[in-house]
Curated annotation (Swiss-Prot):
Role of this protein: Catalyzes the reduction of fatty acyl-CoA to fatty alcohols. Catalyzes specifically the formation of C18:0 fatty alcohol. Provides the fatty alcohols required for synthesis of suberin in roots, seed coat and wound-induced leaf tissue. Provides the fatty alcohols required for synthesis of alkyl hydroxycinnamates in root waxes.
UniProt protein name: Probable fatty acyl-CoA reductase 5
GO biological process: lipid metabolic process; response to salt stress; response to wounding; suberin biosynthetic process
Native organism: Arabidopsis thaliana (Mouse-ear cress)
Keywords for this protein: Lipid biosynthesis, Lipid metabolism, NADP, Oxidoreductase
Entry EC number(s): 1.2.1.84
GO molecular function: alcohol-forming long-chain fatty acyl-CoA reductase activity; alcohol-forming very long-chain fatty acyl-CoA reductase activity; long-chain-fatty-acyl-CoA reductase activity
UniProt xrefs under InterPro entries: FAR (IPR026055), FAR_C (IPR033640), Far_NAD-bd (IPR013120), NAD(P)-bd_dom_sf (IPR036291)
Family: Belongs to the fatty acyl-CoA reductase family.
Tissue expression from the record: Expressed in the endodermal cell layer surrounding the central vasculature in roots. Expressed in floral organs of very young unopened buds and receptacle of siliques.
Length: 496
């Protein structure tokens, strides 16, 4: 065990899958910034060949604003030299055997050199196609494990999952691995992952034999994923396939040290490499921005429920610290919840109040340049009440519009069809988000708390400063949301 993280990273060769993803970028940037003497970073990306992989890494990772601090510290020439010497682009795909690394010489070299394998690759769409979700989140995780076992120097597999693999359980969610043989739904049906794959393949075969369009196949595979997830007690395909991935890792790890990081909702950087950096709208961010744009009038949420968020740089710090602690540890199978609900909770109601104050003071502009005035949102605490509200507020008036369209088809075009599609989209999104906005669980994080305390003690003793902080108690939610996160969304996502 070594909790001097900077020293631990020195001369290490690390494979990172899903390297163009939000969390992976922050993880890679942190390593290069604090330990330029890392030996090598093999970064796996989906690409047709090495040239395409290198181009993706350059445009989607290293040219991003995230790397501006490193670029300022080193200058363009030295940074480019560092990337040339330390980073190896690897075209591949974890959904395929050997991670899709077709270059046998590269594959053999990697298996001789790699010390740490970090699996961040995932599809995070809640209603992903079942074949895609199983391919990446479930059996892709197993492919990464099998590749790691072939690495002769490997000290650890660190797998990034999600805290929401717990499903919709209320109360204190335990920080422990899944035991596949213990997984049964409320009717006693035991989960069989291989059977799930066979069911998926059979459905896909039937659809192809029927000459279904790609659109119909996609819709059918999405429906199958949601159907199987709910049958076994999970709310959606994403968390179901991620949980099965964890189960396969636990069952087949043998003696390989395994650490599973389960972050909650990942948000913008708290402090490193600079505050507020984020890519895309993530979970609760979509709601915040919709509110700022004045288009959110009502929303399904229990304002007293905790919204478990954690800044992305804290997740990266926890990953590095956990790797340093457990690398080379015999028989290790550790789970870390990285979130805030247990030690420093913030509710949806509190977030709304902060958003009201922010957008009242800093209003967005509409397309015509006028300032957007926000008002408080009508929050509806149950799905039944939300459906009733939508029926009375929108669906009944829509029936009148349908009648007008039928009687006077030349006057309105298909206004009914257009508005009905929008309402159906809203209801679909609400159904997907329901498990999270009404979530009643709190994530036990005693493992993470202990890891964080040990790391703080080690850092203060040796360096007198914190370089790998991931203590959620240090987050001031009012300051973070107002001055860092929401302003970061406006700057980096809306480009205002």
């Amino acid at each position: 065990m070594e909790l001097n993280c900077v020293q631990f990273l020195r001369n290490k060769t690390i494979l990172v899958t899903g390297a163009t993803g939000f969390l992976a970028k922050v993880f890679v940037e942190k390593i290069l910034r604090v330990q330029p003497n890392v030996k090598k970073l093999y970064l796996l990306v989906r690409a047709s060949d090495n040239e395409a992989a290198t181009k993706r890494l350059r445009t989607e990772v290293f040219e991003k604003e995230l790397f501006k601090v490193l670029r300022q510290n080193l200058g363009d020439e030295k940074l480019n030299t560092l990337l040339y010497e330390k980073v190896v682009s690897v075209p591949g795909d974890i959904a395929t055997d050997q991670l899709g690394i077709n270059d046998s010489h590269l594959r053999e070299r990697m298996q001789k050199e790699i010390d740490i394998v970090v699996n961040v690759a995932a599809t995070t769409n809640f209603d992903e196609r079942y074949d895609v979700g199983l391919g990446i989140n479930t059996f892709g995780a197993l492919n990464v494990l099998n590749f790691a076992k072939k690495c002769v120097k490997v000290q650890l597999l660190l797998h990034v999952s999600t805290a929401y693999v717990c499903g919709e359980k209320p109360g204190l969610i335990p920080e422990k691995p899944f035991i596949m043989e213990e997984i049964r739904n409320e009717n006693g049906l035991q989960l069989d992952i291989n059977l799930e794959r066979e069911l998926m393949k059979q459905r896909l075969k039937e659809l192809n034999e029927q000459d279904c369009s790609e659109e119909d196949i996609t819709l059918s595979m999405k429906e199958l994923g949601m159907e199987r997830a709910k049958l076994h007690g999970w709310p959606n395909t994403y968390v179901f396939t991620k949980s099965m991935g964890e189960m396969l890792l636990g069952k087949h790890k043998e003696n390989l040290p395994l650490v599973i990081i389960r972050p909650t909702m990942i948000t913008s950087t708290l402090s490193e490499p600079f505050p507020g950096w984020i890519e895309g709208l993530r979970t609760v961010d979509s709601v915040i921005i919709a509110y700022g744009k004045g288009v959110l009038k009502c929303f399904l949420v229990d304002v007293n429920s905790v919204c478990d968020m954690i800044p992305v740089d804290m997740v990266a710090n926890a990953m590095i610290t956990a790797a340093a602690k457990h690398a080379g540890g015999s028989g290790v199978h550790m789970v870390y919840h990285v979130g805030s609900s247990h030690q420093n909770p913030v509710t949806f109601g509190e977030i709304h109040e902060i958003a009201v104050r922010y957008f009242t003071k800093n209003p967005l502009r509409s397309r015509n340049g006028s300032l957007i005035t926000v008002s408080k949102v009508r929050f509806i605490p149950t799905m039944a009440l939300f459906s009733l509200y939508m029926t009375l507020r929108y669906k009944l008036p829509l029936q009148l519009l349908k009648l007008v369209d039928i009687i006077y088809p030349w006057r309105n075009g298909d206004k009914y069809g257009d508005k009905n599609r929008k309402i159906e989209l809203v209801m679909r999104l609400v159904e997907l988000y329901e498990p999270y906005v009404l979530f009643k669980g709190i994530f036990d994080d005693r493992n993470t708390k202990s890891l964080c305390a040990n790391q703080k003690e080690e850092e203060i003793k040796n360096t007198e400063k914190l370089m790998f902080d991931f203590d959620p108690k240090g987050i001031n939610w009012g300051d973070y949301l107002t001055n860092i996160h929401i302003s970061g969304l406006v700057t980096h996502v809306l480009k205002k």
